[in-house]
Amino acid sequence: MQTYLNPVLLAYGTIIIIIKIICFAGNTLVKVLENGKEVEKEIKDVKKDEMVLVRNGKEKRYAKVIDNKTTKGDFEFYIVKAKHLKDPSKTKEVTITPEHIMITFDEKKEIKLLPAKDLKGNEIIDTEDGFHQIYEISKTKLKNKYMLSVKGGVVFANGIFISTICSGDNARDLKPTLEEWKKLQRE
């Protein structure tokens, strides 16, 4: 096993990303396994060792929560709203910090990783029920932000397929790893 700059590891050709983030609002919903059943839980209530719904390539699976900590204070967040491409009455939204990396797709369905602060408001994102287009981005202030560390680097938050990587978290060191991660998502 070859070790890269902490906290990124490359093992047997598979990328394992264990990254601490401080990017989600506490009321963001993730799906966890409880007694063999999938239930929604607010990020602020997710505990270490719980299993959260993630994606590896196109396969949905569960990954272990490594840590979940609260940072108190006043923080800027972006509220990102998106509507379903085929049924605009279906909408989703997520509240994240400006540096939080969004997984977006261009017109050729190529993956582009963008911090929330760089979104233009027309990007395509993937969700549990198909592709959505971002139609509104607004700012808000919240008291706490939540650091959720998960294996795999992605999660479904409020049903949106989103990274668990903030551009401020050793982003310079992660660039090669993110390129490899993007390749895995196409497989």
Regions found by a protein language model. Give the residues of each.
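HINT/intein-family self-processing domains that catalyze protein splicing or autoproteolytic maturation
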Residues: 5-187
